[in-house]
Amino acid sequence: MAQVEYRGTGRRKNSVARVRLVPGEGNITVNNRDVREYLPFESLILDLNQPFDVTETKGNYDVLVNVHGGGFTGQAQAIRHGIARALLEADPEYRGSLKRAGLLTRDPRMKERKKPGLKAARRSPQFSKR
């Protein structure tokens, strides 16, 4: 018998997370490492588990994630987005609660590009009066 698996892709800033949900006991594996080993802050792990809290499915699925690009925060939020999309594939009834929590919306905020003549995106060179 083929194993049931739900997939979701999450994105945030420059991070892309490919998430697979498999019925299990709630283990989260990120890039073949345990999530507590991969992410340095407990707050990021709590953030990542939000879709399970909203849908009350904590401990029902094992999560397998491949994530690349960006930093820890962007990656954690990309994983959260991917988990929400995979849960939606698992049961379309979750759409309302996930949507209300804002977990299905891709956060469009990106790093602003550096402009010519400036030191950074908005930081101008130091002004000298004399």
From Swiss-Prot:
Biased composition annotated in UniProt, kind: Basic residues: 111-130
HAMAP family per record: Ribosomal_uS9_B (MF_00532_B)
GO cellular-component term (any): cytosolic small ribosomal subunit
Native organism taxonomy: Bacteria, Bacillati, Bacillota, Bacilli, Bacillales
Protein's name in the database: Small ribosomal subunit protein uS9
UniProt family annotation: Belongs to the universal ribosomal protein uS9 family.
One Pfam family in the UniProt entry: Ribosomal_S9
NCBIfam families associated with the record: PRK00132.1 (NF001099)
Gene3D superfamilies in alphabetical order: 3.30.230.10
InterPro entries: Ribosomal_Su5_D2-typ_SF, Ribosomal_uS9, Ribosomal_uS9_bac/plastid, Ribosomal_uS9_CS, Ribsml_uS5_D2-typ_fold_subgr
GO biological process terms on file: translation
Keywords per UniProt: Ribonucleoprotein, Ribosomal protein
Gene: rpsI
Domain of life according to the entry: Bacteria
Matching PANTHER family: RIBOSOMAL PROTEIN S9, SMALL RIBOSOMAL SUBUNIT PROTEIN US9M
Region (Disordered): 99-130
GO molecular function: RNA binding; structural constituent of ribosome
